[in-house]
């Protein structure tokens, strides 16, 4: 897992990124069309006990809860690594072959403000709701193709293929088991 980067893709094919490729603490996390940029790529850093910090490739900062908030609608932003649980996440596989990403501190899921799927939609946390707005596909970035803006196993259809779904499920199991076994990159 160490050194591997992923995109966090919504059901419509857009991905989470750092807004305006800003390197400062507090820069928002938003949805945008995939273009292969490093501010759209994330590494899962083992935080122990099945928890993960999600670190941006470009900025080196973690997805965090704005102001450490825990209520529905708290926006996501990036922040330098801390020891706080506001930067810790668990991964939960879904029947659709995607993954829900739950914050440990708030016990809420990564979601989009107003269920918006347009470029620039702000990411937030929200209680569990059925449906695709909280379901994400974690796609490994092919290191050789990353600069060319291509994903490993890229498909035109935003629905995951059986092969992508299997890879997704394998990845979530691998991340979950690595976190419990304290293998992989340490927090």
Where are these regions (language model features)?
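Extracellular glycan-recognition/adhesion modules and their associated mucin-like linkers
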Residues: 1-23, 41-70, 88-117, 135-187
């Amino acid at each position: 897992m160490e050194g591997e980067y992923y995109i966090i893709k919504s059901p419509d094919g857009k991905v989470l990124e750092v807004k305006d490729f800003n390197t400062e603490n507090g820069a928002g996390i938003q949805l945008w069309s995939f273009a292969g940029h490093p501010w759209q790529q994330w590494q899962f850093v083992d935080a122990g006990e099945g928890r993960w910090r999600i670190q941006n490739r470009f900025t080196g900062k973690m997805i965090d809860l704005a102001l450490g908030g825990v209520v529905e609608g708290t926006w996501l932003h990036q922040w330098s690594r801390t020891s706080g649980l506001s930067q810790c996440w668990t991964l939960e596989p879904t029947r659709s072959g995607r993954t829900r990403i739950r914050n440990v501190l708030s016990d809420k899921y990564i979601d989009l403000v107003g269920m918006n799927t347009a470029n620039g939609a702000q990411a937030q946390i929200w209680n569990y709701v059925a449906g695709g707005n909280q379901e994400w596909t974690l796609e490994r970035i092919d290191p050789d193709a990353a600069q060319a803006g291509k994903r490993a196993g890229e498909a035109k259809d935003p629905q995951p293929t059986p092969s992508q779904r299997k890879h997704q499920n394998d990845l979530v199991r691998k991340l979950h088991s690595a976190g419990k076994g304290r293998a992989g990159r340490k927090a």
